[in-house]
Amino acid sequence: SPSLQMASFTITEKGYALTDPKGNTLTAIAADFEKGPQKPDSYLGKVVSLLYHRYLNGKLPIAMVSMDNCSHNGDKVAAAVTAFADAWCERGLAETGFAAYVRDPKAVSYPWSMIDKITPRPDAKVEKMLGADGISGLDAYVTSKHTYVAPFVNAEECEYLVIEDHFPNGRPALEKGGVIFTDRETVDKVEKMKVCTCLNPLHTALAI
């Protein structure tokens, strides 16, 4: 659709990985490199397949926006997308122009973003409050990996979502909902402030 302006991702940092710790291409990714854009099985393969469909139908612009809590997250999306495009083009499974399309900032962008909103383990007080409102089935439990989970999420009130304002097909007015749009350099500075200067160090000190 020409009106589609952005696709957002929250798949964790590992979700963008193409290789294992030894640098070997993951089995599912390697298989999709050979299959091409017609029937990929991996999540990333399906995403790039949709981009290829967009390329074939007018080379329409779009922003691929990672909202995962990892440094320079847009670069991780870009690396995954271009790797798939290159693999398919090299094998003759996609038109050669596709590799250039996903690298053209006027066609496909990969904005950086920084998100900060602490979501601690489920709180018994919140469970009790929701129960008082008539909501049932909220019992928390511990998984086999010792993760404390529940059907509800509680979070701090303070929240920030800062996104690089690079949207080649325009964007929704998300600033009306509190999203901060700025340039890439400022996104990087805000992230460093969070991780190295203000927020995370203070939280660590308070925890100790």
State where each predicted segment sits.
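Substrate/ligand-engaging "lid" and interaction regions
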Residues: 1-208
